[in-house]
């Protein structure tokens, strides 16, 4: 009888964990631990949406760019078929992507705001804000990682972009580059293989869209050249048609189609 009692006590926490409801839970640590123990299929039951998008449904750049071969006469970089399989341009809702991590264009407080920041916090639920509160802010150009909670993405990487008024300075360009590199550092540190980036700093933070795209593409290209075997996909996720057009025009210069 004593042995049976010990068995019940041992397994009681697991029985409790199985009952965690992410929409009502008030303990982010408990919820985070619970989610880590689930399979990918089990996690689906806790997503905030049913129309989530799997990574395999997001086309690689080599597929998106069919028909563009040779249209760029003097690309900035050499053709690399392998790299063209590691990058994607996707227009849609970043909160619905089932990837290892999505990046949040946050403010210094990390407690939510407007634009994509607010969308991510609303979709993930209040537990995300609770965990962010423990991180005690984030400096511009740096990044911090949390659980994704009710998001299809397992993690959220929060980064704070520079605020630019008019033409960005060299310092602001360096800070924007640092946002991407800091986020990618966390990707490697946590052994994650897929990540989606929104357009960082281009909304209310005022960074010009075209100039931002140049910084982003150069940063991702150079990083992938060094780390291509450590990741499966880097996704540039845009929401506005304007940004989609900018990246469609600029991507072939940085990722020429083989």
Curated annotation (Swiss-Prot):
Q: What is this protein called?
A: ADP-ribose glycohydrolase MACROD1
List the SMART domains hit by this protein, alphabetically: A1pp (SM00506)
Location of N6-acetyllysine modifications: 96
- Look up and give the organism this protein is from: Rattus norvegicus (Rat)
**Keyword annotations:** Acetylation, DNA damage, Hydrolase, Isopeptide bond, Nucleus, Ubl conjugation
Q: Which reaction does it catalyse?
A: 3''-O-acetyl-ADP-D-ribose + H2O = ADP-D-ribose + acetate + H(+); 2''-O-acetyl-ADP-D-ribose + H2O = ADP-D-ribose + acetate + H(+); 4-O-(ADP-D-ribosyl)-L-aspartyl-[protein] + H2O = L-aspartyl-[protein] + ADP-D-ribose + H(+); 5-O-(ADP-D-ribosyl)-L-glutamyl-[protein] + H2O = L-glutamyl-[protein] + ADP-D-ribose + H(+)
Q: Recorded E.C. number(s)?
A: 3.1.1.106, 3.2.2.-
Question: Which of the residues bear the PTM N6-succinyllysine?
Answer: 29, 36, 62
The UniProt entry lists the main location of this chain as nucleus
Q: Which InterPro entries match?
A: Macro_dom, Macro_dom-like
Give binding positions for substrate.
92-94, 105-107, 112-117, 200-206, 239
List the Gene Ontology MF annotations in alphabetical order: ADP-ribosylglutamate hydrolase activity; deacetylase activity; hydrolase activity, acting on glycosyl bonds; O-acetyl-ADP-ribose deacetylase activity
Subunit info here reads: Interacts with ESR1; Interacts in a manner that is estrogen independent but is enhanced by estrogen. Interacts (via macro domain) with AR.
